[in-house]
Amino acid sequence: MLGVAAMPSTLALVLKKILIANRGEIAVRVIRAAREMGIATVAVYSELDRDSLHVRLADEAYALGGQTAAESYINTEAVLNAIRESGADAVHPGYGFFSENPDFARAIAAMGVEFIGPPPEAMDEMSDKVSSRLAAVRGGAPIVPGTTEFAQGPDDIRNFGNEHGWPAVIKAAFGGGGRGMKVVKSADDVDDAFASAQREALAFFGRDEVYVERYLTWPRHVEIQLVGDKQGNCVWISSRDCSAQRRHQKLIEEAPAHQLADGIEEAMGEAAVKAAKAVGYYGAGTVEFIYQDGEFFFLEMNTRLQVEHCVSEMITDIDLVEWQIRVAAGEELPMTQDEVTASRRGHSIEVRINAEDPAEGKFLPSPGRITKLVPPDGFGVRFDSGYLSGDEISQFYDNLVGKLVVWGRTREVAIARTIRALEAL
């Protein structure tokens, strides 16, 4: 165990010490927010992360052992042991790893430790795309035409496509990031696509259930950031446009979403809040929609803090991690919907900086030592990272080096500032 003196807690009667069950930039982000609130922090680390930035910044740090994520950050018993040894009274899961695992949330609740996230029952309901679609319908959110049950075989796909038209898309019910997703252009392609989607879903998510829905040919990916409290209040913070993707993975995000038809952003926000309330949601969450031809449809709900939460923070001056912690401590939301709406100003853009090799246009992960990292700065520029010069990027973890986040009074100013900052990186 590594340690330094902890700061006094401003929430001493509720939360005295938070363990961050994660690594990299999100662990650093949570540590900094907790430090500003006067709450002691605990890091956990694999053997490869012993000297990482999040370990250096935390008040205490506990070894999980192992190198891979399976041996360390998603080794349930190792993480639970660190919680016991540290005496932490709350756990922030970050994103990825245990962040959307209701069984983990239940396990730490059984220890008398607060999970800084939504109730496990809400995670259960939003954890697969089929049950989340049903929850959205209960909340009055429009959904893309599709099945509300798992597809039992290729015939279900063919019947749907023949009724609703081609192309259709087969999706992994328990997945995301484009894994287990297959676009089917005609009935002749169904058998191969169904088998491929199931294989990929099982390999990446441990479950092979799939469902089918109408395929929108050129949709935009627009999402709503929201936060709810344990008293039943819920507000939406901002919209975000995450349409700039590669291999179904986000690269550039903006807030607010631009060039939406009149009233669409507000309607999305209201639909997101209704969907969250339908499952008794509290904490930070994101409802994703697809938008095309003036219509929007519920896609899924992410029951965690998103990588791109920063752009919503930049246009509202709301610290979403602080809000997460305060909600977990039982506090009511500090702002009403009208106050949140009035706080929005300007435009923000986030660009993900990844360690990749662009050779032959493949952009494959490129682990190794960072010889020099000089973050850009200047007015309206923020750089969130879990690395410093000399740190090592491991092949076993995500290759995200950092997030360049820029604010401007208009979208045009934000774009110009982003270009300037990228040139300086």
Q: What does each model-found stretch correspond to?
A:
Residues 196, 200, 229-260, 303-330, ...:
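Extended active-site and interfacial segments that coordinate phosphate-rich ligands
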Residues 2-8:
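Intrinsically disordered, low-complexity segments enriched in serine/proline and basic residues
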Residues 333-334, 338-398:
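Glycine-rich active-site loop/lid that clamps phosphate-bearing ligands
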Residues 254, 260-294, 302-359, 423:
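Active-site "cap" helix and flanking loop/linker of ATP-utilizing ligase/carboxylase catalytic domains
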Residues 181-183, 214, 260, 400-409, ...:
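Short, well-ordered beta-strand elements within core beta-sheets of diverse protein domains
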Residues 8-287, 291-306:
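N-terminal beta-alpha lobe that positions the nucleotide/phosphoryl donor
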Residues 277, 390-402, 406-407:
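Cofactor-binding beta-sheet edge motifs in enzyme active sites
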